[in-house]
């Protein structure tokens, strides 16, 4: 039961990340790169190949089709792909670290709704998910994408060293 809830939650959190152009694809490309390197380091060529194929598709998407956002079909596939990779490699919970942006997106929605109900209409963020909050603060989509890329890359590198050493 926990696995089913975890998978559905992760897939939906990746879907929430697809609120601005390029965000879901950028973050997912970095997460898949982590899984490709990790899979290669443990000798799982199937997972490494699948990760590489997803990265290739995402790079093509980012170059040729960044506008409009990919939609639910693409983001739900990516959620299933990154969660499936975590399960294939037997490191299910590592997705909470390497997918920190996904986790922050879904938690911002949970916190916003909870706070709104507890305070009878007050908001914790200007808008949820969190990437829309940053948009309301004046950040451009490309700046939000770049920050999410950097945060994801740092957490993926940390996760790799945490696992390997």
Language-model segments: which ranges?
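Alpha-helical transmembrane segments
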Residues: 2-165
